[in-house]
């Protein structure tokens, strides 16, 4: 019995030693707690940016409903197609050159001409998507200002120009990072009040001045009201846009949590 007990004791010690040695071998492979936390935060950040981008994307439906409801019924299909093409055209132009013009290496002062992030090369897909829906929103602001007053083909040409050149260059002045001359001068734009809405608004002002008033709006110096075709549809559009603002502001901190949460 004493011999059997000694053998079991030796075996237990051998197994314990092997366990300890194996544990020490794999210990370097176990990520540290802070690495796990950082990885989880990064995953949640990507998820949050994607969800916020989806909310902003859905604002296209809000703009469509608002514009269609507040204009004549005959313009409904034209408005729907213009807003649909906004996101389609913006996707192509943004991936090909828009994102590169906004965030590429600065080689010409006020403009990014570096090709390091053209065609999404070297860029996070979630960030490209989030910035894409911002660019599409800037373009669709113009759609509302000239609803029912311009050709479909003309608007598509403008959307290409807006999302490929105007918005990326103006956005890079503020959001590029080090070297963005507006940011370096102390200018602050948290969620696009100027870069998206002011740029889109000024473009809309120029477009409205170019196309002129709607037919029948002015007659012999008298202003004729043109009521909307469906106020309920317009109200629905307002609520959809309201919902989308939470993605606009909440996602603009580009992180899950952090000090900017209160600002959002």
Report each predicted region and the residues it spans:
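Single conserved hydrophobic/aromatic residue that forms the stacking wall/gate
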Residues: 1-12
